[in-house]
Amino acid sequence: MKERIVNLETLDFEISQEVSLRPSLWEDFIGQEKIKSNLQISICAAKKRQESLDHMLFFGPPGLGKTSISHIIAKEMETNIKITAAPMIEKSGDLAAILTNLQAKDILFIDEIHRLSPAIEEVLYPAMEDFRLDIIIGSGPAAQTIKIDLPPFTLIGATTRAGMLSNPLRDRFGMSFRMQFYNPSELALIIKKAAVKLNQDIKQESADEIAKRSRGTPRIALRLLKRVRDFALVKNSSLMDLNITLHALNELGVNELGFDEADLAYLSLLANAQGKPVGLNTIAASMREDEGTIEDVIEPFLLANGYLERTAKGRIATPKTHELLKIPTLNPQTLF
């Protein structure tokens, strides 16, 4: 499948740009109000007790601000944050090296934490519970366990697939937060703030139009903003107005609902099944995409907006999908 403009993952060339647009204060972080309120209370209490924060888990689709909110937590706690990802922690020694370099109250952020191996999790458990690292030296009867005390720290785990976390690991997080999709007004405000940082003039209706097509995701909203800005520059316009915005978004292949070719192909596959469940492996094979991408990238927004149902037997298109694609739902009697 070709690269999608609405891809939820951070593209390589966007990493430095995303950092420059990242909010650094609570007042700059738009949306997720309930989560912010709970975190502010926890941070205030931890600072008054002069303790580290409880370990916390953020879960939800990519691009909703798990990393950004973790940076703000570190800033509010006046401490350091170490960023890593589970696939980078291949051996227990990798984790030990990270943990032994943490200072008191530091934050360790592990992205894709559901991908930690069971062996790594076993090393992590005493570190989370007792701030202790158990290292086994040697093997067989001569093996010895050396215990190393660790400074109190906070582990922040981030995952797009909370269901894949082992129960023992999930139970060790004192706080768990589900990141929600953003509404259009929140996204429009994010777009306006980002435009200021980019020194780009933008009309309110343009920000609203980009927000409407951003799939409830700030990462996509910022990507579309930068792409529309490119179109404005080529048109020799210093202002992003509605005409330029509509032209750019249509050229980029993002419709009024934020759907692209991949979304429409997915929905067409389900709708044409006429109420019969379609298995994930069948969908992945038909779209030439891996099952994880289907589950983590394509389905969440469609599911949240009522375009499909997940059943034990597979995926089923809803009446909303049939109406969108103008594919009639056949009467069951006409199928025979």
From Swiss-Prot:
Instruction: List the molecular function annotations (GO) for this entry.
Output: ATP binding; ATP hydrolysis activity; four-way junction DNA binding; four-way junction helicase activity
Keywords (alphabetical) are:
ATP-binding, Cytoplasm, DNA damage, DNA recombination, DNA repair, DNA-binding, Hydrolase, Nucleotide-binding
Q: Per the record, which residues fall in region Large ATPase domain (RuvB-L)?
A: 1-182
Q: Where does ATP bind?
A: 21-22, 63, 66-68, 129-131, 172, 182, 219
Region (Small ATPAse domain (RuvB-S)) location: 183-253
User: Reaction(s) catalyzed by this protein?
Assistant: ATP + H2O = ADP + phosphate + H(+)
EC code(s) of this entry? 3.6.4.-
> Where is it localised?
Cytoplasm
Q: Which InterPro entries match?
A: AAA+_ATPase, AAA_lid_4, DNA_helicase_Holl-junc_RuvB, P-loop_NTPase, RuvB-like_N, RuvB_C, WH-like_DNA-bd_sf, WH_DNA-bd_sf
| A Gene Ontology cellular-component term | Holliday junction resolvase complex
Annotated GO biological processes are: DNA recombination; DNA repair
The residues that the entry says bind Mg(2+) are: 67
Residues bound to DNA: 310, 315
Q: Where is this region: Head domain (RuvB-H)?
A: 256-336
- Short name of one Pfam family for this protein? RuvB_C
> What domain of life?
Bacteria
Q: What does this protein do?
A: The RuvA-RuvB-RuvC complex processes Holliday junction (HJ) DNA during genetic recombination and DNA repair, while the RuvA-RuvB complex plays an important role in the rescue of blocked DNA replication forks via replication fork reversal (RFR). RuvA specifically binds to HJ cruciform DNA, conferring on it an open structure. The RuvB hexamer acts as an ATP-dependent pump, pulling dsDNA into and through the RuvAB complex. RuvB forms 2 homohexamers on either side of HJ DNA bound by 1 or 2 RuvA tetramers; 4 subunits per hexamer contact DNA at a time.
| Quaternary structure and interacting proteins, as annotated | Homohexamer. Forms an RuvA(8)-RuvB(12)-Holliday junction (HJ) complex. HJ DNA is sandwiched between 2 RuvA tetramers; dsDNA enters through RuvA and exits via RuvB. An RuvB hexamer assembles on each DNA strand where it exits the tetramer. Each RuvB hexamer is contacted by two RuvA subunits (via domain III) on 2 adjacent RuvB subunits; this complex drives branch migration. In the full resolvosome a probable DNA-RuvA(4)-RuvB(12)-RuvC(2) complex forms which resolves the HJ.
NCBIfam families listed in its UniProt record: PRK00080.1 (NF000868), ruvB (TIGR00635)
Question: Family, per the entry?
Answer: Belongs to the RuvB family.
State the domain notes: Has 3 domains, the large (RuvB-L) and small ATPase (RuvB-S) domains and the C-terminal head (RuvB-H) domain. The head domain binds DNA, while the ATPase domains jointly bind ATP, ADP or are empty depending on the state of the subunit in the translocation cycle. During a single DNA translocation step the structure of each domain remains the same, but their relative positions change.
Protein name (database record): Holliday junction branch migration complex subunit RuvB
Question: What organism is listed for this UniProt entry?
Answer: Helicobacter pylori (strain ATCC 700392 / 26695)
Source organism phylogeny: Bacteria, Pseudomonadati, Campylobacterota, Epsilonproteobacteria, Campylobacterales
